[in-house]
Amino acid sequence: MQSSSLGNADDPRFRQTHLFQMLVKVINTSAENATKTAIATSSTSTPSFVDTYSTSSLLGEEGRMVMIVVIGAMFALVTSLGNLMVMVSFKIDKQLQTISNYFLFSLAVADIAIGVISIPMFTYYTAIQKWDLGYTMCQFWLCIDYLMSNASVLNLLLISFDRYFSVTRPLSYRPRRTTKKALTMIACTYIISLILWPPWIISWPYIEGKFTAEPGTCVVQFLQTNPYVTVGTAVAAFYLPVTIMCILYTRVYWETQKRQKEFGKLQATQTWASDVVDRPSTQSFRNSKMWKKVKKFSRRSMKRDVSSTSIIKSSGSMRKKNNQDGYVEDSVTPCTSSRNSKRKSWLRNCTGKSNSSSEDSSEAVAMNLDDTSLSSSHFALSGSRRRNISPPCTPMPTNFEDEEQTDAGASMRNGSARFRSRPSDTGKNNNSDTYTVLIELNDEGSRPSVRLSSCEPYLDEPISTRNRSKSDCNSEIDERRHSLLNKQSPFKNGRILKNFSSQERKSEKEQRKNERKQESKAAKTLSAILCAFIATWTPYNLIVCWEAFFPNTVPNVLWTFSYFLCYINSTINPLCYALCNARFRHTYMRILRCKFKAERPTMNQGYVRRN
């Protein structure tokens, strides 16, 4: 029975049946499952170190790529938006459209190109650790990268030169600094960068006759093959500009400190002079050294302020015009129809008084006693202009402090000097009106007097009216002079100096205050930009010079970080403007609030005064 069964199992016909094949399949499947279970059990008890390392390495590589992409995208976005805000601020705010800010605008253009092109491509190259975008795209990225980076450096150098000349040579440099010249200098920065980098990046493989860059890499070839060219470009692009910028910034800093000290001394001198002028007038005080210093100070102020004029000018009553012969004539303002208004006009013309401020009133009696300038004064009036003028009155002595005269007048004391107007072509006509200025300089203790020549008749008035007006004018002038002399204290006239220069000192103080404020803002901005530039660019240039002579000695991570640090400089620059310039901060806030329209002038002015 058993043999029969075995025989039947060995029968070839039985092996070909469907049942036998199913049994074999089941047996094989069970054995395979048992083997897999045993392997799985042994693997669980003793895990493989290689499999574990591979899994963690894969996860770490993916995490590293994600982190690099996120950081690079964040910096690219911040750099692009920050520099775009600088450009928009320059466009929408008229107060920011200055020549100095043109350089900042150019710097923002270079930085925004770095944020849009250079940072994203470098992020991609660093994340996948190979370059698979092709040779043409590699050359394009390198050319734009080095071009804009070097243009950014040269713009910083241009800003430093602009600040240096503005502080050290304000009178000669600022008037000649125009928008056209600024744009020319900005164009030069890009032209120099264009000559320095892109041609050599593209042509260097052909100059050497071979491509030495490894496949999957994107580098500047001469930075790897020629150490001398590498050092030369580093010196031209970084070391030389940063050295010049440091020297210029040091000079700007010391010049600013020097001006602040000089301004403090000037304020102290002006306060001391004002106190001295208010002291009582005594002969002993006039002979003292302190009074001589006051005289010297007042003469300098007078020479500086009134050296350009040689006539008695009254604000609102005398205006310079050109006649047909090319001479400059001083026409008196037209008088009104009423007789009282004419008298007041004559009185103002003779006394040099007007309804202006104390500064204008003081300027009315200010004269330059230089012979040449006085002799060239022209008072001839053509016949066609005579209906629009008021006649000068008869001679009236005008008190004038001797300490306010210039050195030319000091040499003519104890005598009288008559300065006549230069005859003009119309002087041959009897109808032309001329008058002279008579200055009498007496003893040291007395006051000199200024006299105007006799009045000419007013043509539109009848003879009786003319005579009456002249007598009224003379009487009113005498009364005016008598009342002024009685009201003056012994040293009251010494306050002419104070009245003359008070308004000017105030305006000069405000002007210098604004200049110091602008210089301080510019110095802060320059210092912040310079410090950020040195901190972000120094590591890369040190590594490049080291790698030129000692290749493959610096870790790749350190080289990548130093390269990316140069890009961060373009991110920091807009923040430097905002931190150091309140106007940029204000405009940034306007942009963030989407207020692109111009604000009311009163609001802008109030904001400027607060800052």
From Swiss-Prot:
| Record's subcellular location | Cell membrane
**Main location per UniProt?**
membrane
Q: Which GO terms describe its cellular component?
A: dendrite; plasma membrane; synapse
Disulfide bond residue pairs: 138-218
Name the membrane topology term: Multi-pass membrane protein
Q: Which UniProt keywords apply?
A: Cell membrane, Disulfide bond, G-protein coupled receptor, Glycoprotein, Membrane, Receptor, Transducer, Transmembrane, Transmembrane helix
Region labeled Disordered — which residues? 299-364, 377-432, 446-477, 500-519
Q: Which domain of life is it from?
A: Eukaryota
Q: Where is the composition biased (Basic and acidic residues)?
A: 503-519
Provide a GO biological process annotation.
G protein-coupled receptor signaling pathway, coupled to cyclic nucleotide second messenger
Instruction: Kindly give the InterPro entries that the UniProt entry links to this protein.
Output: GPCR_Rhodpsn, GPCR_Rhodpsn_7TM, Musac_Ach_rcpt
One short Pfam name that applies is 7tm_1
Named from the GO MF annotations, one term is:
G protein-coupled acetylcholine receptor activity
For this protein, the parts annotated as crossing the membrane are: 68-88, 102-122, 141-161, 182-202, 228-248, 526-546, 558-578
Q: Does the keyword NADP apply?
A: no
* Protein role: The muscarinic acetylcholine receptor mediates various cellular responses, including inhibition of adenylate cyclase, breakdown of phosphoinositides and modulation of potassium channels through the action of G proteins. Primary transducing effect is Pi turnover. Enhances the release of the neurotransmitter acetlycholine in cholinergic motor neurons, which in turn positively feeds back to depolarize body wall muscles and allows for the maintenance of normal body posture and locomotion.
Q: Write out the similarity annotation.
A: Belongs to the G-protein coupled receptor 1 family. Muscarinic acetylcholine receptor subfamily.
**PANTHER family for the chain:** 5-HYDROXYTRYPTAMINE RECEPTOR (PTHR24247), MUSCARINIC ACETYLCHOLINE RECEPTOR DM1 (PTHR24247:SF265)
What's the protein name? Muscarinic acetylcholine receptor gar-3
